[in-house]
């Protein structure tokens, strides 16, 4: 029996390549339809979080000077966005900090007097249970009204109660608050 090289080796490869091309184009098409919707939903979610953290604000304008975004510890504690309320009532700062499960993203609202109006963790990779206790609303509430910090570390700052057993996660949240307060000072307030 004579073997047919094309049928045995080349034809299956051609078929698989064609299938891969069809699937690739189908995924690209679906992505082109869904990407703008996903982006719009992300913008709406961020705007809702800003409104929650600074209820006195009507609308926000992004602080555009990217060279003046605070970076307390390169790659570990840095501001990614700063939005200033158009009515001068304050600002909302988005910060990424190193936490137990990787980078933690939090938003911090600061009023026009430099006091924190709220803190919200929007993304994290911390361990569910103990690690996420540092992200709980009852833990984050302790920062409301704060306008300065005594120490960069949550454990060493007497004005903050850190979560015992979740020091790295507690520090991640605290670092973000410190970076947001530094951003407020650097921008010169909310005016």
Where would I find each of the regions flagged by the language model?
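Flexible, solvent-exposed loop/hinge segments and secondary-structure transition points
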Residues: 2-191
